[in-house]
Each structure stands twice: as C-alpha cells, then as structure tokens.
Amino acid sequence: MYQLGVMHYDGLGTNEDPEKGVEYMKKILNSDSSKARHLKFAAAYNLGRAYYEGCGVKHSTEEAERLWLIAADHGNPKASVKAQSTLGMLYSMSALKDLRKSFFWHSEACGNGSLESQGVLGVMYLYGQGIRQNTKAALECLKGAAERGNIYAQGHLVEYYYNRKFYSTAATIAMRTTENDDIDMLAKMTDCLPTYIAKGVAMAAFYLARCLHLGRGVQQDQAAAKKYYSMACLLDPDVASDLELKANLGRI
C-alpha cells in the first residue's frame, strides 16, 4: 500500500494522482496493523510533504510540521531521518523561524547519518546560528560533509579558505566542486536539496572566478574567470549578486 501511495503521488509507473497517493498514506498512518508499523514514519513524512507542497491536499505548513514531528519521532534513528532534516530546514525559514529548534533537528539528523544536515550544522557552527560559534566544530562538520559529497558544504569551505587568504586551497576545492553542474543528478546522488546544491556550486564558481580574475592561488585567466562568474549567476543569481556586492565593496 505504501508503494502504491508513492507511485500515485509521484506518478511512477502510473498516472500521477496525488489525492489517491495521500489517501493511501493516511490509511497507513492510521492503520493498527503490525505490518504497517514500520511504514508509518515514511508515510507521515510523505504526508507532511504533501501538505507543505499543497499537492493532493490543501497547503498547510502547520499540518506539515505536525506530521514531520510524528515522522521524526524525537530523533529516533529508526524513524524518518529525512523528516528530522526537513524539520531543521523548516525551522530556519521565516514563517516558523527558530534557529535553536533548527540546530536541534539538524543535530539529530546528522547523528543518524544525514549528509544534508551535516553540511548545514557546519554552517550553523561557523556563523553561530542557533548555537554558540565554534570554528573547530564547523570545520569538522563541513569537511566531513564535503568528503561525503555535500556540495553546499564544499561551497562554504571555499568561502572559508578564501576569506582567510588560503587562496590555493580555496581554488582547488572550487575547481573540484564546479566540475559537475548537473544539479538534478547531484541531488539524486547525495539526497540533498537541489536549491542548496545550486547555492554550493554558485559559491564555489564565484570564488574560483575571483581567484582567476585576480590571480590568487592560481594563474590569472580572465576568460576562465568570466566563464565561472557566468556559472555562478546562472545557478543562483541571489548568491552571485550578494558576492558581487561584497567584491565591489572590497570585502572579498
């Protein structure tokens, strides 16, 4: 029944029918069957997703939060780790912003193996968001996540090393990060959100362009710099605009 729900919701091997998918998920969540017990966390996560996206049901952030809390089950490693990480993201947004809650859920998810949350934790430690600033813990999380393929973490490592004038290290990581700009493929490979992957590649591309433009840590190459500036603008215009402003003000 769970598989049927997913297939109908996402249109896998059948016509997309989100309403029917939601119906199946609700049946699993409300079932007393022992066979359905291990699927309840996944069903609650997917139902939360449906309410958050307003797909198959009326949009409700509050109902999405309630269902994700059920799916996350107080950080239980056998529950939905995806829900734990998603709650971390949810509490970092303006509508329900609570950075302490965000840090808590990313910590739980990271402890249960979430690659996405490991990268976000690194950023939160680095800038003291929801927790006291701790550069050592930040680098531990960012390096660990980057080694496991977290592009967002790689982008922030590039920024960290560039700002501390370790230009060759920043450029080396940036070159590796920008080798693949197929965001959808990277999202499937790492199970990380495409939005954050795009931000990570855009950050790396902009700092690499800056290194090439000014000859910092690499040989000066204006044509290559232009290429990477364009990549950053294409992948995340907001990130590129923010970094361009910092560059114009002489901060980077």
What are these regions (language model features)?
Residues 1, 10-12, 17, 31-33, ...:
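Short helix-capping/linker turns of helical repeat alpha-solenoids
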Residues 3-10, 28, 44-53, 84-93, ...:
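Hydrophobic face of amphipathic alpha-helices that form TPR/SEL1-like repeat modules
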Residues 16-24, 59-67, 96-105, 132-141, ...:
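Structural signature of tandem alpha-helical TPR/SEL1-like repeats
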Residues 19-32, 140-148, 160, 165-186:
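Long amphipathic alpha-helical scaffold regions
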Residues 28, 71, 108-109, 144-145, ...:
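Canonical positions in the second alpha-helix
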Residues 50, 68, 172, 187-188:
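Intrinsically disordered, low-complexity repeat tracts enriched in Gly/Pro/Ser/Thr and acidic residues
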Residues 103-104, 112, 116, 152-156, ...:
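Extended, charged alpha-helical interaction scaffolds
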Residues 159, 172-183, 210, 214-216, ...:
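Ankyrin-repeat-protein effector appendages
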